[in-house]
Regions:
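Short, solvent-exposed loop/turn segments at the edges of extracellular beta-sandwich modules
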Residues: 82-87, 319-321
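Local sequence-structure signature of Cys/Sec-based thiol-disulfide redox active-site neighborhoods
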Residues: 103-148
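Beta-strand-rich structural segments
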Residues: 16-18, 26-39
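Exposed beta-strand face motif in extracellular beta-rich ectodomains
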Residues: 28, 73-77, 307-311
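Bacterial Sec-dependent N-terminal signal peptides
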Residues: 1-22, 85-93, 97, 105-109, ...
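Short, conserved sequence motifs used for protein processing/export or organelle targeting and
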Residues: 147-345
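Short tyrosine-centred short linear motifs in exposed loops/low-complexity segments
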Residues: 25, 69-79, 236
């Protein structure tokens, strides 16, 4: 990238890009520089790139200056920088992402991951949970929900260590309930109606991959052997998240509800300890159209009801040089069963 600092007047914020065109293959990147006068502020956490695509505006993480995509089209970028107040760039840069096609492209079904935070001490959570269930009924087979429990007023007996890890990944927000789509920051919503936010998330992207899951279970040993597969239309590097969830969990009181209450989508374990996911294929780009597999094993706790449990796997991609990862597609199966790749009709 050439040195543009000399052309930026003092007190002016301006953004530059090293490319005006990239392939929409999830691999090729454009790199930005943000100048405040003669000062390069690109890497500062108070400097944010604002991306606009098809009318939708998204704020990239502070200090991030790389962008790739799997969705062809025209993107515009401007910069915001906090310096005794919010400053915005006096220009925008345009990046065109051209279609990437190898002749082997599959039309994978677009399923969305919903990461939900709730608590037995939250009086508003039952209404939000009902709203999520209504959304799943309206769009059957299209949404996988995983629910982290957290303490609120009282200690929640279904809280796990990973609750704090994933909560931190979303900026350590305050207040419940919260639902995030596809591990994407800024998508959180309290509900209880989630339809608009779900449809907006669908419009953000077209999935580039499919996910298959097998969950073989030994009732005697309670050992669960999980095998997952990812097939991709693009030569991108993927990660994956793997959740064990249980439905119809009873025996715990719920604030805001009189009498018994069944908890759904309760995360019992996360077999990948980073909220960014675990690398697959040793972190190397996936061969287009070829399946790459990974496996995990776990012994189920005696208190968990295997008959009510599911395995949820999300394939993760980064569009900002590996700083953040979001779910590109998700699939799930019951413990003791399997599910193959799903295709749109």
């Amino acid at each position: 990238m050439k040195d543009d600092s000399a052309v930026v007047p003092d007190g002016v914020l301006r953004v530059f890009a090293d490319k005006s065109e990239i392939k929409a293959d999830g691999v090729e990147e454009v790199t930005f520089r943000v100048m405040f006068g003669s000062q390069d502020v690109t890497a500062e956490t108070t400097c944010t790139l604002i991306r606009t695509f098809e009318g939708n505006q998204n704020y990239m993480a502070g200090g991030v200056n790389k962008f790739s995509t799997t969705a062809p089209g025209t993107y515009t970028f401007k910069a915001r920088y906090y310096y005794a107040g919010a400053l915005y760039s006096d220009n925008e840069v345009e990046v065109v992402a051209t279609p990437y096609f190898t002749g082997e492209e599959e039309n994978y079904l677009q399923r969305v991951l919903g990461v939900y935070f709730t608590s037995t001490g939250c009086t508003s959570c039952p209404t939000a949970s009902k709203g999520i269930a209504n959304l799943q009924q309206a769009y059957p087979g299209m949404i996988s929900i995983v629910s982290f429990h957290d303490d609120m007023v009282v200690d929640d007996p279904m809280k796990i260590e990973e609750t704090a890890v994933f909560k931190a990944a979303f900026g350590g927000f305050q207040g419940l309930p919260r639902l995030f789509w596809n591990m994407r920051n800024g998508t959180d919503i309290i509900g209880p109606v989630f339809t608009d936010s779900y449809l907006e998330e669908l419009g953000q992207y077209t999935p580039s991959c499919g996910v298959a899951v097998s969950a073989a279970y030994d009732e005697n040993t309670r050992k669960l052997d999980i095998e997952l597969g990812i097939k991709s239309n693009i030569p991108a590097s993927y990660r994956y998240l793997l959740f064990l969830v249980e439905d119809d969990v009873d025996g715990y009181e719920q604030a805001g509800v009189n009498g018994s209450y069944l908890h759904q989508n309760v995360i019992r374990d996360v077999l990948v300890k980073s909220a960014s996911g675990e690398k697959i294929n040793n972190g190397l780009p996936l061969p287009v159209g070829s399946e790459v597999k990974a496996s995990k094993s776990v012994v189920l706790d005696q208190s968990w009801n295997a008959d009510n449990m599911r395995v949820v796997v999300a394939a993760m991609l980064s569009s900002d040089g590996g700083f953040t990862f979001v779910a590109d597609n998700v699939n799930e199966c019951a413990v003791g069963s399997s599910v193959s790749y799903l295709y749109a009709e």
